[in-house]
Amino acid sequence: MSERSVSKRTEQKRWYTVQAPEQFDREVLGKTPAEEPDKVLGRTIETTLGELTNDASENNTKLTFKINEVASDSAYTEFIRHELTRDYLRSLVRRGSSKVEAYITVLTTDDYRVQIQPVAVTTKKADASQEKAIRRTMIDLVRETAEDHTFEQLIDSVVEGRLSSAIYGEAKDIYPLRRVEIKKTTLEARPEEVAAEEETAVDVDEEDVDVEA
């Protein structure tokens, strides 16, 4: 392809300003080019919490958003993932300490399915029963939080550190803790996707029922 053809195609593309969701104050995430608005939909963009808040101490928190709406020259996004950097997570663990993790899938009050991965780091080596008790506390608190939070409220609780602080407050009585963090949060399914899965499950169950003549 000639340089002129490439240049012409580039000129035909339109630039869209990508914005964070309203809960992140519609902060500008960047710009993305496309020939048609539909080609912008589904694109993802990663940033850090520090870039959104102008606080360098938050640069260890990565946020990923997905474009789900385009209007005029603006591309709007939804939150799909929160994750702490590997370097930061490694810095939490000291020799002779224990790292306790859990993987919890929850449903918010507005029917978003989310997986949350908390991690607790102890000051010294904990035994198996103590690790189990800490993990149980993490699971219970994450589930309780999801049961009375909308998706937006739950993400705010994670990103702002309230959920990890609540876990720390409960679990530190089991064994001294150095730190509790939410390692990763992932949007697994939206309400319409959850409803479709439930409908499919019901259809399958009905097909499995034996009807006696």
Swiss-Prot record:
GO terms for cellular component: ribonucleoprotein complex; ribosome. One of its GO terms (molecular function) is structural constituent of ribosome. Residues 194-213 have a biased composition (Acidic residues). Residues 189-213 are annotated as: Disordered. One of its GO terms (biological process) is translation. The keyword Ribosomal protein applies. SMART domains: Ribosomal_S3Ae (SM01397). Keywords: Ribonucleoprotein, Ribosomal protein. Pfam families: Ribosomal_S3Ae (PF01015). The keyword Cytoplasm does not apply. It comes from the Archaea. Belongs to the eukaryotic ribosomal protein eS1 family. This is Small ribosomal subunit protein eS1. It comes from Haloarcula marismortui (strain ATCC 43049 / DSM 3752 / JCM 8966 / VKM B-1809).
